[in-house]
């Protein structure tokens, strides 16, 4: 019974950290300095039920997108369920979850750091390819694709910093506190 409570508390702690990270998206920040990549990597690493590993981080991202797009930014006149280009962002998010699920079986500083850097590159490549593929800003040739990636480079700083800082926070807090025994009556 005690082991079952510890497992439930651990699982609940993982979910709380993911939800907390998604809430931090509403705090003003430098461009692209967000927790979304870290949420995906963390969820993939610790939620060993494959269904939960994908559902919880993606649902958390989507709910925070609903709040941001409809109440904080309100770019659109109507209620926005999905924004243009969301498939590119969510696809990269799913790949990052898979990276966490497959490659972070043993958590170490090195493994988290390497997967964080790789994940930020994957996010950058996929989402900016999506910007180019939309056909609305760049010519639909190799030159347009190169210009798109070059224009996105200044934003990569925020992306990689966000991935590193939030991954350090999520993995660090969880690894530091996972063995703390809470007594309750």
Q: Where are the regions a protein language model picked out?
A:
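Short helix-perturbing small/polar motifs within transmembrane alpha-helices
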Residues: 74-124
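Hydrophobic core segments of transmembrane alpha-helices in multi-pass, intramembrane catalytic enzymes
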Residues: 36-40, 88-96, 166-167
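Hydrophobic transmembrane alpha-helices
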Residues: 4-46, 51-56
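Aromatic-anchored segments of alpha-helical transmembrane domains
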Residues: 18-27, 58-71, 120-129
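Membrane-embedded alpha-helical hairpins and interfacial helices in multi-pass inner-membrane proteins
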Residues: 105-179
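Hydrophobic alpha-helical transmembrane segments
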Residues: 11-16, 51-55, 87-91, 113-117, ...
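Short, charged juxtamembrane terminal tails flanking transmembrane helices
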Residues: 5-6, 178-185
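Structural signal for the C-terminal ends of transmembrane alpha-helices
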Residues: 23, 42-49, 95-107, 173-181
């Amino acid at each position: 019974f005690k082991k079952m409570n510890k497992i439930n508390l651990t699982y609940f702690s993982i979910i709380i950290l993911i939800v907390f990270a998604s809430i931090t998206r509403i705090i003003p920040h430098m461009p692209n300095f967000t927790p979304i990549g870290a949420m995906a990597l963390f969820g993939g690493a610790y939620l060993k039920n494959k269904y939960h590993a994908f559902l919880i981080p993606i649902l958390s991202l989507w709910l925070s997108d609903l709040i941001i797009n409809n109440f904080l930014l309100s770019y659109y006149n109507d209620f926005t369920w999905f924004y243009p280009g969301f498939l590119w962002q969510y696809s990269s998010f799913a790949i990052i979850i898979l990276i966490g699920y497959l490659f972070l079986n043993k958590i170490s500083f090195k493994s988290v750091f390497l997967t964080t850097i790789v994940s930020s590159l994957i996010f950058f490549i996929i989402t900016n390819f999506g910007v180019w593929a939309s056909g609305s800003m760049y010519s639909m040739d190799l030159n347009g694709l190169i210009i798109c990636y070059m224009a996105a480079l200044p934003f990569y700083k925020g992306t990689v910093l966000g991935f590193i800082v939030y991954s350090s926070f999520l993995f660090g807090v969880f690894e530091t506190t996972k063995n703390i025994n809470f007594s309750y009556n």
